[in-house]
Structure formats: structure tokens, C-alpha cells
Swiss-Prot record:
Reactions this protein catalyses: N(2)-acetyl-L-ornithine + L-glutamate = N-acetyl-L-glutamate + L-ornithine; L-glutamate + acetyl-CoA = N-acetyl-L-glutamate + CoA + H(+)
Protein name: Arginine biosynthesis bifunctional protein ArgJ
Entry keywords, A to Z: Acyltransferase, Amino-acid biosynthesis, Arginine biosynthesis, Autocatalytic cleavage, Cytoplasm, Multifunctional enzyme, Transferase
PANTHER family on file: ARGININE BIOSYNTHESIS BIFUNCTIONAL PROTEIN ARGJ (PTHR23100), ARGININE BIOSYNTHESIS BIFUNCTIONAL PROTEIN ARGJ, MITOCHONDRIAL (PTHR23100:SF0)
Xref: SUPFAM superfamilies: DmpA/ArgJ-like (SSF56266)
């Protein structure tokens, strides 16, 4: 079960004018499950995205990049689960193109106006004829209040659907923001198997949206790790339909700061939901690193701790074997780090300082914190004012079982 997370009810996920979603059972890999999602966008939407940095990026990722770089007005997204269409070479690229062609014909748009997404098993061909056969049902299901169904339809090893919504009012205009994400394993995004889709009915200039999607990813999806693996298919897409009447052309526009903060908050909620549902996770851990020369070195330390199987298994066992955290700080790649200046806390319990165990630290205090479902590891590098946070989870027996049984 996820750590302190429940899928919002359908009526808690607000429609975004200009964006309609439909789902269908296409039997991409398994029967009797919704595994195909179609998103139709009204004319005038702006769209931006960031994608995996894995060199074996999936065929749909390659096509998405091309369609966005070409400046085409995006009118549709098509998402399948079960098969990732990654590691499939030229046939995979042809399959991704065929998906776009089929959506374009169905909706009366151009193939270049379609963004395809796939998630699931790598190295297996996508049964595109099944996808195409499922599209009419997905089209028939298109509606603005379908975020809840879409959140379920993009799941793979997820145990819960992940979604979030906010409404903000600026300059007298009500602005809706809704999004869904999926992922539970192969999670160490580097936008760089994680997918995130967010839409708002604000009007946002293309250049601002391009910048915002990167900033939001850096504050959210690029701060999470379940197992340290970067998927071939990671994608985060942001849509601005412009139908609320609220328009933002420059970053100095009145109300922009509030809208931007709300969009980033939804992104963080979607990203943290992935960690809370990490495969086999029993604990949610925030690694908050401060006192760095820059945020990049803080993030390095955060990821060193968050990736470490030894640290993560200690959290699962509620075992305050905290030397593992110090070891991770030491190998994080900060070559001129003065270890005597480093301090480490578990929540408010000071664990280490001056190069060793804190004088007042008692193991029973560490064990008490380690037994909690939510824990903050705070590290002060003592060398500057920068800070960054990484979100991770523990490693349990179930992580091994889930991944050992994944294809069965």
C-alpha cells in the first residue's frame, strides 16, 4: 500500500476547459484493463515537454521531441500502457508513427500534431493494431471530467492511480490546474517508467511554458528516486489551453507568480505520489540537504543517500545503522568536502557532527524516528547557503518480488 497517499475522488479532479480525455481497453498486454488513453486538445493550446535522458530512449519519446521541436500545434496525445516500445529499433519508430497516423485520421488532424507515449515492458514490440482498434472507444469516451479514469488507465506496476488538482483565482479569473502521473519502479527521472501530464486553462506564452515545464520538473520529478534506474520512457508534458480568460505573456504579468507556484505545487504532489507508491515502499523519506556551495552539489548528496540500497534497507528495517548515511555523503562526489563540517539529523535528532557520532545522540532516539512512516534526513554540508531536497522510499522484500514477477 502507498505511504500516506490515496487517489483523489473523481469530483476532486477539476476539468480543464479545452482538454478532453478518453480511455479504453485495447488489450495491449493484458485483457480486461483500461490501457489506452486519448487526450484531445482544442485549437489554440500551447504544449511543452521534457523527456528522459536515457540514450536508449523509446521510439515515442523520439517522435514527441521531433513534433514539439517542429513547432507543430499539438492537438492530441495518445498513451498506452503494457508495452514501452523501447529497444525496438526502426520497427518501433514505425509503430509510434502508425499510432500518430491513426489518431490523426480519427480526429481529423495531422500526424505531426499528435504526441505518442508508451510505458511498460522494454524490448517487446507494441501491438499497434490493437492500439488502433481501441482508439474509437477512447474517442467515444472523451470528456473534460475524465482525469480520474485517465489516472487509472496509465498505471503499470502502480498500486494506486495518481492525480492532483488545484484552482486559483487571479485578477478575477478562476484558473484550473489538473494532472496525472504514473510510476512506481525504474524511477530516477532525469528530464531529463515515469509519465506525468498536467494541464491548465490559463493562457501561457510558448516560451514561458517551455521554461516552466523545466522548472517544474526540476522541482518535482527530477527530485525523486525509488531505485535509481532512469527509464527509457520518462516524459512530463504541460498543456495550457487558454480558455480561462487569464493570459500570461511575460513573467512580470500580475498573478503569474501565484499561477506558477500552483502549477509547481501540483507537479510536486504528482511526483511525491510516485515515491509514496514506490514498489514495495513502506516509508516516505525526504532527504533535505543544505549548506552547499550550489544546489547541484546538494542534489548530488541527496541522491547518493536516496539511491543507496544499504540506506534504504536500513529504513525498511527501522534500523538506525546511520553510518550508511555518512558513507553515502562521503561518496557523493564532492571532492573538497570537509567532513568535520558536516552535520546529519533524523527529523530533529542530531546524529552526526564533527566527523563522527554526535555526543548527545542515543540509538533509541534514532530507532524511534526510523520506525515512522515519514522521515526527514537533514544534512548540513557547512560550506554555503544552497539547498535541495530529494524524495525517496525504503527497499522492502516486496520490491524484489514485484520486479521478479513483473513479466509473469
Amino acid at each position: 500500500m502507498p505511504v500516506n497517499y490515496a487517489t483523489p475522488a473523481a469530483d476532486q479532479l477539476f476539468p480543464v476547459a479545452g482538454v478532453r480525455l478518453g480511455v479504453a481497453e485495447a488489450e495491449i498486454r493484458k485483457k480486461n484493463r483500461r490501457d489506452l488513453t486519448l487526450v484531445a486538445l482544442d485549437a489554440g493550446c500551447t504544449v511543452a515537454g521534457v523527456f528522459t535522458q536515457n540514450r536508449f530512449c523509446a521510439a515515442p519519446v523520439q517522435l514527441c521531441r521531433n513534433h514539439l521541436a517542429g513547432g507543430h500545434e499539438i492537438r492530441a496525445l495518445v498513451i498506452n500502457t503494457g508495452i514501452a516500445n523501447a529497444g525496438t529499433g526502426e520497427p518501433g519508430r514505425q509503430t509510434a508513427q502508425a499510432s500518430c497516423d491513426a489518431v490523426a485520421e480519427l480526429l481529423g488532424i495531422k500526424a505531426e500534431q499528435v504526441l505518442p507515449f508508451s510505458t511498460g515492458v522494454i524490448l517487446e514490440p507494441l501491438p499497434v493494431e490493437r492500439l488502433k482498434a481501441g482508439l474509437p472507444a477512447a474517442k467515444a469516451d472523451l470528456k473534460a471530467d475524465n482525469w480520474h479514469a485517465a489516472a487509472h488507465a496509465i498505471m503499470t506496476t502502480d498500486t494506486v492511480a495518481k492525480a492532483a488538482s488545484r484552482v486559483v483565482t487571479v485578477n478575477g479569473k478562476k484558473i484550473s490546474i489538473s494532472g496525472v502521473s504514473k510510476g512506481a519502479g525504474m524511477i530516477k527521472p532525469n528530464m531529463a517508467t515515469m509519465l506525468g501530464f498536467l494541464a491548465t486553462d490559463a493562457s501561457i506564452a510558448q516560451g514561458m511554458l517551455d521554461k516552466l515545464v523545466k522548472e517544474a520538473a526540476d522541482a518535482s520529478f527530477n527530485c525523486i528516486t525509488v531505485d535509481g534506474d532512469t527509464s527509457t520512457n520518462d516524459s512530463f508534458v504541460m498543456i495550457a489551453s487558454g480558455q480561462s480568460g487569464a493570459s500570461f505573456a511575460t513573467e512580470t504579468d500580475a498573478g503569474w507568480a501565484e499561477v506558477k507556484a500552483a502549477i509547481i505545487a501540483v507537479s510536486v504532489e504528482l511526483a511525491q505520489a510516485i515515491v509514496r507508491d514506490g514498489e514495495g515502499a513502506t516509508k516516505f523519506i525526504t532527504v533535505a540537504v543544505e549548506g552547499g556551495k550550489d544546489s547541484e552539489e546538494c542534489r548530488k548528496v541527496g541522491y547518493a543517500i536516496g539511491h543507496s540500497p544499504l540506506v534504504k534497507t536500513a529504513f525498511f528495517a527501522s534500523d538506525p545503522n546511520l553510518g550508511r548515511i555518512l558513507a553515502a555523503v562521503g561518496y557523493a562526489g564532492i571532492n573538497d568536502l570537509d567532513v568535520d563540517g558536516v552535520r546529519v539529523w533524523l527529523d530533529e535528532v542530531l546524529v552526526a557532527e564533527k566527523g563522527g557520532r554526535a555526543a548527545a545522540y542515543k540509538e533509541e532516539d534514532g530507532a524511534r524516528v526510523m520506525a515512522q512512516a515519514e522521515i526527514t534526513v537533514r544534512v548540513d554540508l557547512g560550506r554555503g547557503a544552497a539547498k535541495a531536497s530529494v524524495y525517496t522510499c525504503d527497499f522492502s522484500y516486496d520490491y524484489v518480488k514485484i520486479n521478479a514477477d513483473y513479466r509473469s
